[in-house]
A protein has these predicted regions:
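Catalytic beta/alpha-barrel core
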Residues: 136-144, 150-233, 243-246
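Glycine-rich phosphate-binding active-site loops on the catalytic face of alpha/beta enzymes
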Residues: 203-211, 241-255, 281-303
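Active-site-adjacent beta-strand/loop module that shapes the phosphate/pyrophosphate-binding cleft
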Residues: 76-100, 112
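Conserved Nudix-box catalytic region and its N-terminal flanking loop in Nudix hydrolases
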Residues: 19-62, 178-180
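Charged helix-capping and loop-helix junction motifs
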Residues: 256-264
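Conserved N-terminal beta-strand and adjoining loop/helix that marks the start
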Residues: 2-24, 75
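Catalytic cores of alpha/beta
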Residues: 179-198, 209, 226-237, 264, ...
């Protein structure tokens, strides 16, 4: 009986490079493994090399960028017919000053455009994670999770942190991937629940006092920001998205001065994160928000 040969197991590091909420994508040639498909920058981890150093080296060699901060994004182990790949994903933000250094033929794509590109199968969960929805409903009522429209997340703000895990246990676990909770709530959840929620939110004061080392690598963080300083700080520590508020006067915080769409646009277009407009908005304001460089909108009363 012919002895079966074990499939090679290859360690790979891959970079998700982001600039102004767009992702850098290339093309795999026909003679490469999984050729004639789109790809993110990256390559094999060499013997004795750490995955993050491999990522940094590959980006320098392939793209021409020597970036300082990489944040762990995900880990995927995928079995093809001929090989097993262990994929270490990292993400990094690219400054405007570095754009001219990028080698050809890399191209920037919007997050929602990625789902229309033919990537290797192992990348499918990453494409899904990068394609952030456009609307976020904010509520204290966890039952709203069962009533979300298509294309919505729920940012849940429970009255009692202590009961959060018990309440979530009563919900359909398939819906947790559309849930955002504050870090204090997240810490009280079960390990399984922590893995299933979409993002962990940081309040403004939490963002401003945190350092890169305070964030758990591989977790998606969503910051609450009110100005240029907090947006910059959120991006610096590795947040992937942010609320920017208040755009308009709100019933919940009438004393807060509204920034208006012009100021919002000026701040949002300078950020590399996915920025959501928040404050005095209703669902029909999405088209306006997109014109002013928002990735999407969020609201309490009208979502």
């Amino acid at each position: 009986m012919e002895e079966l040969m074990a499939k090679p197991d290859i360690r790979v590091s891959i970079a998700i490079l982001i600039h102004q909420n767009k992702v850098l994508v290339g093309w795999r040639e026909a003679d490469q493994h999984q050729g004639n498909k789109y790809e993110f920058p990256g390559g094999k981890v060499e013997a004795g090399e750490s995955p993050i150093n491999a990522c940094r080296r590959e980006v320098l060699e392939e793209v021409g960028l020597d970036l300082e901060n990489y944040f762990k994004f995900d880990f995927i182990r995928h079995e093809y017919e001929d090989v097993i790949v262990s994929l270490n994903f990292y993400f990094a933000y690219v400054k405007a000053a570095d754009l001219d250094k990028i080698k050809q033929p890399w191209t920037w794509y919007r997050r929602d455009e990625l789902q229309d590109l033919n990537f290797p199968k192992a990348n499918k969960p990453i494409i899904k994670r990068l394609n952030l929805l456009k609307k976020i409903k904010i509520s204290e009522d966890i039952l709203q999770l069962n009533q979300l429209e298509e294309g919505q997340y729920l940012y849940w703000r429970p009255e009692s942190i202590d009961q959060a895990s018990q309440l979530l246990a009563q919900m359909n676990p398939n819906f947790l991937s559309r849930l955002i909770v504050n870090i204090d709530v997240w810490k009280g959840l079960s390990e399984l629940q922590q893995k299933m929620v979409k993002m962990v939110q940081l309040k403004h004061h939490q963002v401003m006092k945190m350092q890169i080392s305070d964030l758990i690598q591989g977790i998606s963080y969503f910051a609450s920001c009110h100005d240029q300083e907090s947006l910059w700080q959120a991006q610096r520590i590795g947040c992937e998205a942010a609320f920017l508020s208040p755009v308009q006067t709100t019933e919940s915080h009438p004393e807060a001065e509204a920034m208006g769409w012009k100021t919002f646009a000026n701040l949002a277009q300078k950020s590399d994160m996915a920025v959501y407009a928040l404050g005095g908005l209703k669902s029909t304001d999405l088209a306006t928000a997109l014109q002013y460089y928002a990735h999407g909108i969020a609201g309490i009363r009208y979502m």
